[in-house]
């Protein structure tokens, strides 16, 4: 099958039109995890294992979350006349997630141009949409929040990178250190374009009715995706 997408086109009044829009949104986690705080953990665990009390009082949920802020900006230029018109839109979006790792930066553009010859016989059109997406995430944030001992501290001024080093061999980790020190992201580059050449033959055979259309067209298009995944752990971590 064939899918036809109608894109916004430029104006035909001979003027250049410019529009700009911006928006800011905020996101905050609603704390719904019913887990032990440090005092409850001490009352439950130290009865059978006094060594499990590491002396701190850490709210791991608060330690890994933040206020998420998203900025969005869009700028558009359009113009043209009865035979040629164009429209160019550029946008930028930066989203900071509610955990320390998650974020997304995205920017791109969409350009369209079309031209019809004076006799209305030929029409040429082209569209191009490039886009770049950078994103970071961690799949283990809230699992660590649930498992971590709330008497474990986050920071240790004596360690090489300033974070408390969890005992090896356990199933918990300093998730704050992991989110801040590790790099685990994806970069995606997208490019979509198409060009169309069309001919309307009917006016040649029936010049008395130029509004009638018998169109034949050829379209060439391409969709390209480049994806890069990167992961880095510094030597001071772990």
Region spans (language model):
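N-terminal, post-signal-peptide soluble/periplasmic segments
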Residues: 1-58, 116-147
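Short Gly/Pro-enriched turn/cap motifs at secondary-structure boundaries
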Residues: 64-68
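Flexible loop and strand-edge segments within Gram-negative outer membrane beta-barrel domains
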Residues: 29, 58, 70-91, 95-102, ...
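Residues on the lipid-exposed face of transmembrane beta-strands in outer-membrane beta-barrel proteins
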Residues: 7, 20, 37, 69, ...
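Short loop/turn motifs that connect adjacent beta-strands in outer-membrane beta-barrel proteins
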Residues: 10-16, 80-83, 118-124, 202-214, ...
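Charge-patterned, long linear interaction tracts outside catalytic cores
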Residues: 187-188, 194-201, 207-220
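Membrane-embedded beta-strand positions of outer-membrane beta-barrel proteins
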Residues: 18-22, 88-90, 124-126, 195, ...
């Amino acid at each position: 099958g064939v899918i036809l997408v109608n894109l916004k086109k430029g104006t035909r009044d001979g003027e250049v039109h410019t529009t700009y829009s911006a928006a800011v949104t905020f996101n905050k986690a609603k704390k719904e995890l019913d887990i032990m705080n440090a005092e409850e953990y001490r009352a439950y665990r130290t009865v059978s294992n006094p060594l499990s009390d590491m002396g701190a009082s850490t709210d791991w949920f608060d330690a890994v979350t933040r206020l998420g802020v998203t900025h969005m900006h869009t700028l558009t230029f359009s113009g043209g006349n009865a035979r040629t018109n164009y429209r160019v839109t550029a946008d930028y979006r930066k989203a900071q997630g509610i955990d320390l790792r998650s974020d997304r930066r995205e920017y791109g553009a969409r350009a369209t141009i079309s031209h019809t010859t004076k006799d209305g016989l030929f029409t040429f059109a082209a569209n191009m949409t490039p886009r770049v997406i950078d994103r970071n995430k961690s799949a283990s944030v809230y699992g660590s929040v649930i498992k971590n001992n709330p008497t474990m501290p986050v920071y240790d001024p004596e360690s090489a990178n300033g974070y408390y080093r969890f005992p090896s061999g356990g199933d918990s980790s300093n998730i704050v250190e992991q989110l801040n020190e590790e790099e685990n992201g994806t970069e995606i580059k997208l490019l979509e374009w198409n060009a169309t050449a069309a001919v309307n033959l009917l006016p040649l055979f029936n010049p008395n009715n130029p509004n009638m259309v018998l169109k034949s067209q050829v379209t060439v298009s391409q969709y390209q995706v480049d994806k890069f995944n990167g992961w880095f752990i510094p030597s001071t971590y772990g």
